[in-house]
């Protein structure tokens, strides 16, 4: 009897101990899971009354990924990545190439979302960005853009941009004539959950004034201008916002990867900087090796004499302060160089941020309409007469036929230059782009 009692007490204690241990494990697991869930929630950017010391790290496992990936066959992947499907005798393909400047057939087969290779340096994966950064308004202007390409641009932005940094996407339709960009576009914008505003111009304004219209409707701290046929890459926005947060007068561009116009293959860009020649033709130049010296290596921001203009970020108040775009320039062309000179000569800085990557379709040029050629000439001359000082003669030596062409009233822009206390073009050559002065005698 006594043995039975002792045995019962022993097994009872053992059972109690087991249940106690299981209860402890259960409670501990719930506590850890709850803490992990909370710790993964991003801190609201610029939220009032919060002191933020925590940093968000975007490594290879923490990069936001598209919520839907279009499934494709191996054949489709081969077509898009290797370009093996390009049929030079396909009349439909040539018709679309002439209309849109790139291979629309492959674009449509990809759907509106796809994964692109992460082309950043491995050192970029170790970069830390604060949880508290400025918010961004993305401005995308379009005119008769292929509908799927526009959706690919918007989808890549919404899928690969943290929602707490994305204030809004502002679409500016510059009076497109394509039916798909009317009711169909309005219908599909519902999928972007209210983050997208669309402005429809009542007359054709051209890219420059369309961007000014978009910027006037923005409410984010930073304006990010994107072309309507690009795809942003992973962790593309944070490096741009971080640079601007450190220096409000810094204007920044991503490193622009190439999306082939015929195969839509996404190709990484080498480290480059934007420059131009005395014909005012923009071009990409290699970066000097000594500029990449130091602990940051290939992730170091690249000092750039000029920007290509299609994709860049600038603090909204600074954009207004330095005079936005020259609103009397027409359509597009050379507004990028005018803004680049103004940034450098009027107290700002222009950098390319290698850890930010955006792919851009290099559309096939099939000849410019006479209206665009006329607009570019007009824009050339406004830039030359406002910003080049005595060096404008270098331009006219190469383009003598433009010396007596009219270019409108530039008084407002000349007064802006005086009001901002801008430096001379000689200063720009001495301090920003000495290689251009060295080429003075090369015609």
Swiss-Prot record:
Q: Which residues bind substrate?
A: 174, 204, 228, 332
Entry keyword set = Differentiation, Disulfide bond, Endosome, Glycoprotein, Manganese, Membrane, Metal-binding, Signal-anchor, Spermatogenesis, Transmembrane, Transmembrane helix
What SUPFAM superfamilies has UniProt attached to this entry?
Nucleotide-diphospho-sugar transferases
GO terms under cellular component: Golgi apparatus; late endosome membrane
* Residue stretches spanning the membrane: 5-27
Q: Does the keyword Protease apply?
A: no
Q: Where in the cell is it found?
A: Late endosome membrane
What role is this protein assigned?
Probable inactive glycosyltransferase required during spermatid development. May participate in protein loading into the acrosomes and accumulation of ubiquitin-proteasome systems around the head-tail coupling apparatus region.
Q: Which disease is it linked to?
A: Defects in GALNTL5 have been found in a patient with primary infertility due to asthenozoospermia.
Q: What is known of its domains?
A: There are two conserved domains in the glycosyltransferase region: the N-terminal domain (domain A, also called GT1 motif), which is probably involved in manganese coordination and substrate binding and the C-terminal domain (domain B, also called Gal/GalNAc-T motif), which is probably involved in catalytic reaction and UDP-Gal binding.
Q: Which family does it belong to?
A: Belongs to the glycosyltransferase 2 family. GalNAc-T subfamily.
Q: What is this protein called?
A: Inactive polypeptide N-acetylgalactosaminyltransferase-like protein 5
Q: Which organism is it from?
A: Homo sapiens
């Amino acid at each position: 009897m006594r043995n039975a009692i002792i045995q019962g007490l022993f097994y009872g204690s053992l059972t109690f101990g087991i249940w106690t241990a299981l209860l402890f494990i259960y409670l501990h697991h719930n506590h850890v899971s709850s803490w992990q869930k909370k710790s993964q929630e991003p801190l609201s950017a610029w939220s009032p009354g919060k002191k933020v010391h925590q940093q968000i790290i975007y490594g290879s496992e923490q990069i936001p990924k598209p919520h839907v990936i279009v499934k494709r066959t191996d054949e489709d992947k081969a077509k898009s990545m290797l370009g093996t499907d390009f049929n030079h005798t396909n009349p439909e393909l040539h018709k679309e190439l002439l209309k849109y400047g790139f291979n629309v057939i492959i674009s449509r087969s990809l759907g509106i979302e796809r994964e692109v290779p992460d082309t950043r340096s491995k050192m970029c994966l170790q970069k830390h960005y604060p949880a508290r950064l400025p918010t961004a308004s993305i401005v995308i202007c379009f005119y008769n853009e292929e509908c799927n390409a526009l959706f690919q641009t918007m989808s890549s932005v919404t899928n690969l941009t943290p929602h707490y940094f994305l204030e809004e996407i502002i679409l500016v339709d510059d009076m497109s004539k394509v039916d798909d960009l009317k009711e169909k576009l309005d219908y599909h914008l519902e999928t972007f959950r209210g983050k997208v505003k669309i402005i429809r111009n009542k007359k054709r304004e051209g890219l420059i004034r369309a961007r000014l219209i978009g910027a006037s409707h923005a409410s984010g701290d930073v304006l990010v201008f994107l072309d309507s046929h690009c795809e942003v890459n992973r962790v593309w926005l944070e490096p741009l916002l971080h640079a601007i947060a450190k220096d409000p007068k810094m204007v920044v561009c991503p490193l622009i990867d190439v999306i082939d116009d015929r195969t839509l293959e996404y190709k990484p860009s080498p480290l480059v900087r934007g420059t131009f020649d005395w014909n005012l033709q923009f071009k990409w130049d290699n970066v000097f090796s000594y500029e990449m010296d130091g602990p940051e290596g290939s992730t170091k921001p690249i000092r750039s004499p000029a920007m290509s203009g299609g994709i860049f970020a600038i603090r909204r108040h600074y954009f207004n302060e330095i005079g936005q775009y020259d609103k009397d320039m027409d359509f597009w062309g050379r507004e990028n160089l005018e803004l680049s000179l103004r940034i450098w000569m009027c107290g700002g800085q222009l950098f390319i941020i290698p850890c930010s990557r955006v792919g851009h379709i290099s559309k096939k040029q099939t000849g410019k309409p006479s209206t665009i050629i006329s607009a570019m000439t007009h824009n050339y001359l406004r830039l030359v007469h406002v910003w080049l000082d005595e060096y404008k003669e270098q331009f006219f030596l190469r383009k003598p036929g433009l010396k007596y062409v009219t270019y409108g009233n530039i008084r407002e822009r000349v007064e802006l230059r005086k009001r901002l206390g801008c430096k001379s073009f000689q200063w720009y050559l001495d301090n920003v782009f000495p290689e251009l002065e060295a080429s003075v005698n090369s015609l």
